[in-house]
Amino acid sequence: DMYPYFWLFGGTLTDDGFTKATGYLDSDASIAAMNKLIELHDQKIFTIRDVDGSVDAWDGINSEYAMFFEGPWYFGSYDDCEAKGIVAATIPTYEGRSASVVGGEDIAVFSTSKQKDAAYEFAKFMTSEEVQLAMLEAGQLPILKSLVENDAVKNNPVWSVYMKQMESAKARIPSPNNAAIQEIWSEMVTSIFVEGADAAQAMHDAAAKIDGQLS
């Protein structure tokens, strides 16, 4: 996921209301952020899995990599991370900024449900501290702010780091057309890093296309 690095170097996807990409994705700051990524990629400091075919964390990390970006579920799936020398750390800052991406699943009660009361009780149960702490063991971060200071989180060398990083996390563009927007982003990245397209022009074109998905 390139978004965190793009944000880290000062890039912006849209306005705060997620209504327009033109003027944001193709702003001077965003173009500078992309050029920084190009510079790091050319120096082989930064790799892009879908561009370089580089291995991801699930296929095995070796000493070739100093850092990789992965969600908390990675540590919930592998008990031997520490033995391999893999430890959780916040993303390095750049000009005082750090960045990450936040996502998740939804739980809802449908207005057409025949068992609204039971469904509501189930939703309350799933969002209770008891269940959220249990899900933490599987690598799912709790959704409750009340658990940030819980000892199970604070005293854990993995979960405490991820909760700290959440302070600078941003959401992907919340749109029913998100799949199309992701495709536009991917095509832009491919054109820049594989085909050698001019970053400014590629970002301008992508911004216009994303505008069409946001309208």
Regions found by a protein language model. Give the residues of each.
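Glycine-centered hinge/linker elements that transmit conformational signals in sensory
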Residues: 19-50
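Short, well-structured alpha-helical segments that form the helix of a local strand-helix-strand
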Residues: 199-211
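Long, aromatic- and glycine/proline-rich binding clefts that accommodate carbohydrate-like moieties
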Residues: 89, 136-187, 191
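Short helix-initiation/N-cap motifs at beta->coil->alpha
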Residues: 48-59
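Extracytoplasmic/periplasmic substrate-recognition and gating elements
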Residues: 43-46, 79-140, 190, 194-197
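Extracytoplasmic/periplasmic solute-binding protein
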Residues: 1-23, 65
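Beta->alpha turn/N-cap motifs
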Residues: 54, 69-75, 105
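Paired acidic/hydrophobic, glycine-rich loop segments that form the ligand-binding mouth/hinge
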Residues: 66-71, 87
